[in-house]
Amino acid sequence: MDATIKSIRPSKPSDRQPESRPAELDPAEFLAAAVRADQPRPARAQAEAAVKTLLAYIGENTEREGLLDTPRRVVEAFDELYQGYHQCPAEVLDRTFGETAGYDDFVLVRDIEFTSQCEHHMMPFYGKAHIAYTPVERVVGLSKLARLTDIFARRLQTQEHLTAQIAAAIDEVLKPRGVAVLIEAEHTCMSVRGVAKHGASTFTSRFTGMFRDNPAEQARFLSLVRGTR
């Protein structure tokens, strides 16, 4: 891990561009639940029938004993794996605390384990998120950063988009002086199919505010994330 993190170097002043949030990260969209309660969806029976069709497509006998309950189980698993579509990121960060005794440094929660699903192949990718923010007077409960990560992870994702969404949500709701997010993950769509490279890790990062503008703060964040392994 050390060698890979060292390759994520703090940006030089000449490299930095004016900060802008990608168009797809409109706060009105990514801070609300992705699926509205009144949004039409296929019935559960239709979802189970679709699973049965896929089983038939790969050549399975859908009537054999071991597969009779598989469509139901798969749909139930989807309800769990993709529950983030029905959860609101803004609500997770809504409650803050002002009793900080004048604390003026950044807050870092590292090694937040997560599992998500690649939107290209619908195969899992999993790893750890490291999140820091520098509060302005008020802080959020530490567990909320883990909950926020899970909400976005329990949707179809790319690692790049997941990283950007976490940072943008904290930036938009908490209005901190800066946010830093680093995600390291292994993608099964790369390890068990295609090139089949087991153990290959992907690192993505997103810096805003003081972390984006101050290479020393980026370096300090990366040093603390690297820590003792």
Curated annotation (Swiss-Prot):
The pathway noted for it is: Cofactor biosynthesis; 7,8-dihydroneopterin triphosphate biosynthesis; 7,8-dihydroneopterin triphosphate from GTP: step 1/1
The answer, when asked if Mitochondrion is one of the entry's keywords, is no
Disordered, as annotated region: 1-25
Recorded GO cellular component terms are: cytoplasm
* MF (Gene Ontology): GTP binding; GTP cyclohydrolase I activity; zinc ion binding
**Which residue stretches does the UniProt record annotate as biased composition, category Basic and acidic residues?**
12-24
Q: Enumerate the SUPFAM superfamilies for this protein.
A: Tetrahydrobiopterin biosynthesis enzymes-like
Which reactions are catalysed by this chain? GTP + H2O = 7,8-dihydroneopterin 3'-triphosphate + formate + H(+)
Which Pfam family, just one, is annotated for this protein?
Answer: GTP_cyclohydroI
Which keywords has UniProt assigned to this entry?
Answer: GTP-binding, Hydrolase, Metal-binding, Nucleotide-binding, One-carbon metabolism, Zinc
| EC main group | hydrolase
Identify the EC number(s): 3.5.4.16
* UniProt-annotated binding residues for Zn(2+): 118, 121, 189
Q: Name one GO biological process term.
A: tetrahydrofolate biosynthetic process
Instruction: Tell me its family.
Output: Belongs to the GTP cyclohydrolase I family.
The protein's assembly and partners: Toroid-shaped homodecamer, composed of two pentamers of five dimers.
Q: What is this protein identified as?
A: GTP cyclohydrolase 1
Q: Which organism is it from?
A: Bradyrhizobium diazoefficiens (strain JCM 10833 / BCRC 13528 / IAM 13628 / NBRC 14792 / USDA 110)
